[in-house]
Amino acid sequence: MAIRVLIMAGGTGGHIFPALAVADRLRAWGVEVVWMGTRHGLEAELVPKAGYPIEWISIGGLRGKGLTHWLRAPFKLLLALSQALRALRRWQPAVVLGLGGFVSGPGGLGAWLLRRPLLIHEQNAIVGTANRLLAPLAGRVMEAFPGTFPPARKAEWTGNPVRESIEQLSESRARLQARQGCFHLLVLGGSQGARILNETVPQALALLPTKVRPQVWHQCGSRQWEGAVVAYRAAGVEARLVPFIDDMAAAYAWADLVVCRAGALTVAELMAAGIGALLVPFPLAIDDHQRANADYLVVAGAALLLPEKELSPSRLAQEIERLGADYSTFISMAQAARQLHRVGAAQRVAERCLEVASG
C-alpha cells in the first residue's frame, strides 16, 4: 500500500505553488498525495488541474479583519476543525504537511488531535500566524529563509520549493550575455495582480526615450487586465499584457530584469532563476513580511528596494534607465540572486515527509 501524505496549502500562489512542487516530487516517488484547501482560494483551480484529490474546509484569514469577523471566528474555526477531522479520518494520512496560510490552522490542529505526524514549512522571512501556532505541535519545522524561526524550534533551512523547470534554467551569465537588442523587462503582479504596478509601469516607460525603452512582458492579473490595457494604451507604450503566466520558466529565461512585489514565491523564483529585480513590497502584507523577503535579496546585491510610498513614474523610470545603461549590472544582480538559492528544496521537503512516514 502506497504511503499517503496530506498537504495543506491554500489562498495565494505563494503557498500553493511551493506545495505543488513538493506534491509533484512525492507523486513521482509513488506517494499518494491528498490536498486540503478552500473553495475560494487559488487551489480550487490549480490543485484539481494538477490531478490531486482535494478536501474542502470553510476557513478564511482573521488578521486585518473587522470586529464582525472576529466575533464569528470561534464558530468558523470549530466548523473548519470538524471538516478537517472528517477529512483526516477518511484518508488516514501517514504524514500531514502544512505550508502556511489559514487552511493549515484547522488541519494542523486536527492532525495533532488525531496523533498524525505533522510537518510545517514557512515560505516567508517572517513566520505567519498559522505556522507560529502550529510550530509547538509539529514534529518537523522547516523554513525557506535561514533564521526565520527562533532557535528553540530547531527549524531546518530547506529553501523554498519551486518548479523544477525554473531550477533547470541555464546559468545567469550565459543566458544574459547572449542577449541582443533592447533589454527585456518582466513585470509581475503576483497571482492577484498589483494595480499600482499596472498603473505606474506604463507611465514610467512613457518617460523614457524610445531608443532606451525595454521590451515589456507584463503579468497583470485576470481582474485587472482590462485596466492595464487601458493604462498602456493611454501611455502610448507597447507591451505584451497577460492576465497570468503558466510557464514561468520561459518568462524568467526571457527576462533581463523583473519589476515585482516581494511575495515568497516570487522571491524564491528570482533566486532559482538567477535574475535581478526592482522589488516593490506590498505595504499591507501581514507583519510587513514582503519587506523582510525583499531585504534578503537587497542585502546580497540581487535586487533594489523601491517602497510603494516612494514609487512614482519618474522614480521608476530613473531606476530602469540607470540599470539598463550598464548590462553588467543585470549580470551581477542575477549571479547574486542565483547564489542565494538553496537547490533542491522540493526534494528536501518531500524527503522529510518520507522520513517521518517511515520512521
Curated annotation (Swiss-Prot):
Superkingdom of the source species: Bacteria
Functional note: Cell wall formation. Catalyzes the transfer of a GlcNAc subunit on undecaprenyl-pyrophosphoryl-MurNAc-pentapeptide (lipid intermediate I) to form undecaprenyl-pyrophosphoryl-MurNAc-(pentapeptide)GlcNAc (lipid intermediate II).
One GO location term (cellular component): plasma membrane
Keywords: Cell cycle, Cell division, Cell inner membrane, Cell membrane, Cell shape, Cell wall biogenesis/degradation, Glycosyltransferase, Membrane, Peptidoglycan synthesis, Transferase
Protein's name according to its UniProt entry: UDP-N-acetylglucosamine--N-acetylmuramyl-(pentapeptide) pyrophosphoryl-undecaprenol N-acetylglucosamine transferase
Organism for this UniProt entry: Nitrosococcus oceani (strain ATCC 19707 / BCRC 17464 / JCM 30415 / NCIMB 11848 / C-107)
UniProt record similarity statement: Belongs to the glycosyltransferase 28 family. MurG subfamily.
Subcellular location: Cell inner membrane
Main location: membrane
Reactions catalysed: di-trans,octa-cis-undecaprenyl diphospho-N-acetyl-alpha-D-muramoyl-L-alanyl-D-glutamyl-meso-2,6-diaminopimeloyl-D-alanyl-D-alanine + UDP-N-acetyl-alpha-D-glucosamine = di-trans,octa-cis-undecaprenyl diphospho-[N-acetyl-alpha-D-glucosaminyl-(1->4)]-N-acetyl-alpha-D-muramoyl-L-alanyl-D-glutamyl-meso-2,6-diaminopimeloyl-D-alanyl-D-alanine + UDP + H(+)
Gene Ontology biological process terms from the UniProt entry: carbohydrate metabolic process; cell division; cell wall organization; lipid glycosylation; peptidoglycan biosynthetic process; regulation of cell shape
Cited InterPro entries: GlcNAc_MurG (IPR006009), Glyco_trans_28_C (IPR007235), GlycoTrans_28_N (IPR004276)
Pathway(s) the chain acts in: Cell wall biogenesis; peptidoglycan biosynthesis
Gene that this polypeptide is encoded by: murG
Residues binding UDP-N-acetyl-alpha-D-glucosamine, per UniProt: T12, G13, G14, N124, R163, S191, I245, A264, L265, T266, V267, A268, E269, Q290
HAMAP family named in the record: MurG (MF_00033)
A Pfam family: Glyco_transf_28
This enzyme's EC code(s): 2.4.1.227
GO molecular function list: UDP-N-acetyl-D-glucosamine:N-acetylmuramoyl-L-alanyl-D-glutamyl-meso-2,6-diaminopimelyl-D-alanyl-D-alanine-diphosphoundecaprenol 4-beta-N-acetylglucosaminlytransferase activity; undecaprenyldiphospho-muramoylpentapeptide beta-N-acetylglucosaminyltransferase activity
Membrane topology recorded in Swiss-Prot or TrEMBL: Peripheral membrane protein
